[in-house]
Amino acid sequence: RSQTVTGVQTCALPIFWSEAGPRSFWMKDTTIPLSIAFMDRRGRILNIERMAPLRQDRFHRSQGLARYALEMNQGWFARHGVEPGDRARFRLPGGPATHPAPEKGHSR
């Protein structure tokens, strides 16, 4: 299944999957440079990939099993000091902050 961001100049796209798994993205038909952070089921950033626009020949893959991803304008993560190993919290519209589930056998 292909997912793309087209026709926009800025980007902040959260992506959620029901299960953690290996993930990959490409930049076909996407005209702005993006960065993507792949996160595990606990919200820990596995890796951040810089993605060049309109590239159909390069896939950007998670370095581990990803449950979440966040696409931002390229360089956003670096400018804000976000790096692999950091953890994210999410706030869904109209709801409280969501903390990704801890690993089995671990408490918060």
Feature map (PLM): residue ranges:
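Single conserved hydrophobic/aromatic residue that forms the stacking wall/gate
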Residues: 1-11
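Short, P/G- and charge-enriched loop/turn segments at secondary-structure junctions
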Residues: 1, 23-24, 56-58
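Well-ordered alpha/beta subsegment
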Residues: 53-106
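Mid-length scaffold segments of soluble, non-membrane domains
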Residues: 15-48
